[in-house]
C-alpha cells in the first residue's frame, strides 16, 4: 500500500550537519573549473600531434641542395637527418631511434636536425672561404656536400629533442619557452611516468610538434585562457626590446653573413642608411622581414646570381617568381605559399590578437611598433609561450595563497 507523504518523510533519515557539508563540498568541487595552470596540465602533447603527418626526413647522404629542395617541397623550415644505427653520435649525445614495429629491431638513427639557418650558415661560410666574392664562388659545388656535414652549424642543430606524448602542455611550454622550436614525439608510446624531455628514445615512428602547434592550440582554446590572453603584450612583458635590424639597401650576401655571426633566424629590414650592417632597430621604420626561410623560396639555380641584390630586390624577385609558378592542383603558389607579410602590432594589442596574427599569417614573430610605425621591439613564439606560462603560474600561486588564508 502506498505510504503517505508524512510516512515517507519520517522514514527518510535527516542528514547530519557534517553530511550536509560533505555534500555541498562535493557539489562545489564538481562545479569548480581548473584555472589556466590546471587546464594546461590536464591536456597532453598527444593532442597536438593527433592530426599531424609522420615525420619528414632526409638521409644523411642527401646533398644540401637536395635538402633545400625537400624543405621547399614540404613547406617546412627544418627536417631530421636519418642514418643507419650504430655509426653516429646523435646531436647533443641523443639516441633517437626508429624501430621495426613487428620485430623491434632498430632500423634508423636520427642524428640531428637541419634547418634553413644551417644552410644559410653554410652558404655564408662558403662565401668567406671564397674571399667574399660571391660571383666567383662555386655555389653549386658547395651545395653538393652531404647534409650531415652542416648539422650543428646553428645552435638549434646542436641538440635533438623528444617529448613524451603524455607530457602536459604546461611542461611542453616550459621547454619551448626556453628557445626550443620543435621536438619529436614518439608514436604509440604507453609510458606514463617518463621524463618530459628524453635523451634516449626508440619508437616505430615519430611526429614533430612545434612552437606553432602549441600557439595554435592556445588560440583555438582562447576561452579557457581569456584572463591571460585578454591582457596586452606590454602588460604581460612579452615584448623583446633587443631587436637588431638591417637597412633596406643592404645586399643579401651581407645580410647572410650578419645573421650567421649573430645566430639570427630573421631580421627586420628598416628604412635607414647607417654604416653598420647590423644596427639597433628601435626607433626606425620597419619595411620588410628577411629570414632564413626566404632562401628556401629561392630556386637554387637563381640563388648565386641573386646574392648581390639588395634585400628588397631579392624579396621582389622571389615573390614575382612564385607568382608565375603553379603546383599540382592548379592553384597559384602566390595564393598559398607567398612569403609572409610584414606583420606588426602595437604594445596595447592583446596577446589574443597577437596569437591570431601569427596563426593566421603563419609567421614566427610580430614586430611591435608605435603609432608612427617606428620599431619598438618584437614578440616571438618563444615570447608568447613564456608569457602565457608565467602568467598561468602566477595566477595559480595567487589562488593557492587565497585558499591557504
Regions found by a protein language model. Give the residues of each.
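Tandem CBS (Cystathionine beta-synthase) repeat/Bateman regulatory domains
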Residues: 1-405
Amino acid at each position: 500500500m502506498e505510504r503517505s507523504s508524512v510516512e515517507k518523510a519520517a522514514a527518510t533519515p535527516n542528514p547530519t550537519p557534517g553530511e550536509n557539508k560533505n555534500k555541498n563540498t562535493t557539489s562545489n568541487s564538481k562545479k569548480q573549473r581548473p584555472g589556466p595552470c590546471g587546464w594546461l596540465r590536464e591536456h597532453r602533447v598527444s593532442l597536438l600531434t593527433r592530426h599531424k603527418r609522420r615525420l619528414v626526413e632526409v638521409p644523411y647522404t642527401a646533398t644540401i641542395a637536395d635538402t633545400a629542395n625537400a624543405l621547399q617541397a614540404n613547406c617546412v623550415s627544418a627536417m631530421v637527418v636519418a642514418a643507419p644505427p650504430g655509426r653516429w653520435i646523435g646531436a647533443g649525445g641523443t639516441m633517437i631511434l626508429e624501430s621495426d614495429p613487428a620485430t623491434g629491431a632498430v632500423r634508423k638513427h636520427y642524428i640531428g636536425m637541419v634547418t634553413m639557418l644551417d644552410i644559410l650558415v653554410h652558404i655564408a661560410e662558403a662565401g668567406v672561404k671564397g674571399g667574399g666574392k660571391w660571383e666567383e664562388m662555386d655555389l653549386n659545388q658547395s651545395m653538393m656536400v652531404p647534409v650531415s656535414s652542416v648539422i650543428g652549424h646553428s645552435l638549434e642543430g646542436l641538440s635533438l629533442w623528444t617529448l613524451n606524448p603524455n607530457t602536459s602542455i604546461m611542461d611542453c611550454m616550459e621547454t619551448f619557452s626556453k628557445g626550443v622550436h620543435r621536438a619529436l614525439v614518439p608514436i604509440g608510446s604507453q609510458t606514463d611516468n617518463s621524463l618530459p624531455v628524453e635523451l634516449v628514445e626508440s619508437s616505430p615512428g615519430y611526429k614533430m610538434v612545434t612552437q606553432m602547434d602549441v600557439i595554435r592550440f592556445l588560440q583555438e582554446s582562447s576561452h579557457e585562457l581569456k584572463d591571460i590572453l585578454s591582457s596586452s603584450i606590454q602588460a604581460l612583458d612579452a615584448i623583446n626590446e633587443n631587436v637588431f635590424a638591417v637597412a633596406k639597401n643592404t645586399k643579401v650576401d651581407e645580410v647572410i653573413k650578419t645573421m650567421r655571426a649573430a645566430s639570427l633566424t630573421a631580421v627586420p629590414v628598416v628604412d635607414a642608411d647607417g654604416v653598420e650592417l647590423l644596427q639597433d632597430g628601435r626607433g626606425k621604420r620597419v619595411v620588410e622581414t628577411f629570414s632564413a626561410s626566404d632562401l628556401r623560396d629561392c630556386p637554387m639555380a637563381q640563388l648565386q646570381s641573386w646574392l648581390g641584390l639588395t634585400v628588397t630586390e631579392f624579396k621582389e624577385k622571389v615573390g614575382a617568381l612564385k607568382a608565375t609558378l603553379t603546383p599540382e592542383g592548379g592553384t597559384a603558389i602566390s595564393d598559398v605559399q607567398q612569403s609572409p607579410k610584414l606583420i606588426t602590432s602595437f604594445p596595447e594589442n592583446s596577446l589574443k590578437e597577437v596569437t591570431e596574427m601569427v596563426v593566421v599569417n603563419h609567421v614566427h614573430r610580430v614586430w611591435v611598433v608605435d603609432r608612427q610605425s617606428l620599431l619598438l621591439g618584437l614578440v616571438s613564439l618563444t615570447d608568447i609561450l613564456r608569457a602565457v606560462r608565467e602568467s598561468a603560474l602566477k595566477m595559480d600561486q595567487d589562488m593557492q595563497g587565497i585558499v591557504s588564508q
